Amino acid sequence: MTWRHHVRLLFTVSLALQIINLGNSYQREKHNGGREEVTKVATQKHRQSPLNWTSSHFGEVTGSAEGWGPEEPLPYSRAFGEGASARPRCCRNGGTCVLGSFCVCPAHFTGRYCEHDQRRSECGALEHGAWTLRACHLCRCIFGALHCLPLQTPDRCDPKDFLASHAHGPSAGGAPSLLLLLPCALLHRLLRPDAPAHPRSLVPSVLQRERRPCGRPGLGHRL
């Protein structure tokens, strides 16, 4: 073999080695780039998932800025005027829902769900929570509406008669006064200058004094 063949062989081998080296470098760069891209995508998804969950659930909890009203009107107790709703919702008449439970009501509206218009009042000069007697019914003003109890005085509509019907009788207040009468009489007898030395002797005399008719002239004290 001549020297030309040796030179050609060396050139071919060196060219092949360079091609192999370039191919390996390209494969390494491609592999590293793919791993970095996968890592970036995973990091972005991990960062976005809590944000999306928080925003979506926050929207479900707080509701819209304009509020959302109940599907059915709230029933009210005619006796006490308290609303009873199986599915509480926010808010009526343009109220703003806060934290899913409270309503910020616009002007002239009040109530838990902004359902009462203060401009439409059945109470006249009565304030919220005040009681009144209306057509023999005891009524209470609740958010501008009168809520009345069942008829309590079918024969008489005087408020004094209504209060007297709930009393226990005329002798209910007399028992405490009778119980206090005997100690007061004993104390009065003890403070007298001519009281006897033994307190036991006071009891018959006090009892006799209490049995004596009061206010009749000509009767004196017997000690």
From Swiss-Prot:
One of its GO terms (cellular component) is plasma membrane. It is a lipid-anchor; GPI-anchor. Disulfide bonds join C90-C97, C91-C103, C105-C114. It comes from the Eukaryota. InterPro entries: Cryptic/Cripto_CFC-dom, EGF-like_dom. Glycans are attached at N52. Residues 86-115 form the EGF-like domain. GO terms for biological process: anterior/posterior pattern specification; blood vessel development; determination of left/right symmetry; gastrulation; heart development; nodal signaling pathway. It is linked to Heterotaxy, visceral, 2, autosomal: A form of visceral heterotaxy, a complex disorder due to disruption of the normal left-right asymmetry of the thoracoabdominal organs. Visceral heterotaxy or situs ambiguus results in randomization of the placement of visceral organs, including the heart, lungs, liver, spleen, and stomach. The organs are oriented randomly with respect to the left-right axis and with respect to one another. It can be associated with a variety of congenital defects including cardiac malformations. NODAL coreceptor involved in the correct establishment of the left-right axis. May play a role in mesoderm and/or neural patterning during gastrulation. This is Cryptic protein. The gene is CFC1.
